[in-house]
């Protein structure tokens, strides 16, 4: 009986350690000692143009472009959204290549970079933008000193591919449910947590576009990472449901193996 009790206690201790350290265990299991090799280039189909040997450009309309990292294993897609007076870059990949060069080939408007969330494969890391705007959340605001925000390990997750923790210079705070004006093109900031606590989506109500980041895209969604929460996912889903119509086109930040822009209708 004593032996059984000791085994039960030992199992409880081990289980408690696993639960307490689950985020560290998950990161360790995801960490690679080498950068992932680039995928072979493919014909991306009608409407897609190879910018160089890494980026593809997909024209959604005259003022909206998807910039694909179609040789990166996560198949990231970032979005250039043009107004009359300024433009938004929504996500910037890992920074393995400088997306700014691609953006400069498409517009000379002033650029504001807006990350959908703070994971390493979306913030560009070493890529520098003139202006960076972040969602206005108390747990981010309180950590800012001299407009600088140092990301935390679980916000960034960059160690899985060897990226150091970056520091972002915050030029503008985006209040959830408010509208940012690009000049003849208003975008509504939707707070859509779930994938992370800081996830946002951008809604172009006039065009019927929702840029959803990692909250929603074709393929497997990640609601189990550090900083993820399934209850928050429900909240974010309700926000999108109440803000969008049935005709909205949803553009995500990743795709599965299918060609083209990751879009849901």
Annotate each PLM feature.
Residues 1-50, 235-265:
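Accessory terminal helices/loops
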Residues 22-43, 85-106, 153-167:
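An N-terminal domain-start capping segment
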Residues 53-105, 202-213, 217:
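Conserved beta-strand hairpin/beta-sheet module of binuclear metal-dependent hydrolase folds
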Residues 61-66, 177, 185-188:
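Short, hydrophobic/aromatic-rich segments at coil-to-beta transitions
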Residues 65, 112-114, 133, 172-174, ...:
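Hydrophobic/aromatic beta-strand patches that form the interior of the parallel beta-sheet core
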Residues 83-85, 106-110, 126-131, 205-207, ...:
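Short glycine/proline-enriched coil/turn segments at helix->beta-strand junctions
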Residues 87, 94-95, 179, 186-193, ...:
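Metallo-beta-lactamase
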Residues 96-181:
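Active-site HxH/HxHxD metal-binding segment of metal-dependent hydrolases
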């Amino acid at each position: 009986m004593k032996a059984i009790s000791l085994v039960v206690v030992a199992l409880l201790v081990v289980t408690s350690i696993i639960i307490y350290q689950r985020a560290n265990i998950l990161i360790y299991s995801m960490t690679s000692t080498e950068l992932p090799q680039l995928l072979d280039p493919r014909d991306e189909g009608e409407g897609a143009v190879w910018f160089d040997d890494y980026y593809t450009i997909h024209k959604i309309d005259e003022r909206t472009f998807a910039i694909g990292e179609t040789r990166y294993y996560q198949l990231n897609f970032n979005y250039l959204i043009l107004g009359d007076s300024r433009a938004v870059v929504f996500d910037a990949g890992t920074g393995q290549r400088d997306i700014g060069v691609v953006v400069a080939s498409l517009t000379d408007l002033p650029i504001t970079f807006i990350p959908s969330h703070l994971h390493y494969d979306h913030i560009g890391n070493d890529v520098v933008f003139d202006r960076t705007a972040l969602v206005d959340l108390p747990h981010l605001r309180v950590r800012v000193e001299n407009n600088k925000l140092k990301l935390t390990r679980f916000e960034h997750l960059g160690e899985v591919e060897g990226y150091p923790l970056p520091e972002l210079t915050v030029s503008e705070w985006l209040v959830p449910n408010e509208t940012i004006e690009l000049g003849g093109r208003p975008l509504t900031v939707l707070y859509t947590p779930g994938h992370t606590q800081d996830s946002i989506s951008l809604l172009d109500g006039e065009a019927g576009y929702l840029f959803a980041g990692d909250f929603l895209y074709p393929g497997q969604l990640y609601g189990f990472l550090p900083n993820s929460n399934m209850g928050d996912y429900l909240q974010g889903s309700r926000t999108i449901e109440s803000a969008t119509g049935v005709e909205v086109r949803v553009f995500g930040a990743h795709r599965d193996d299918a060609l083209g822009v990751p879009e849901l209708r």
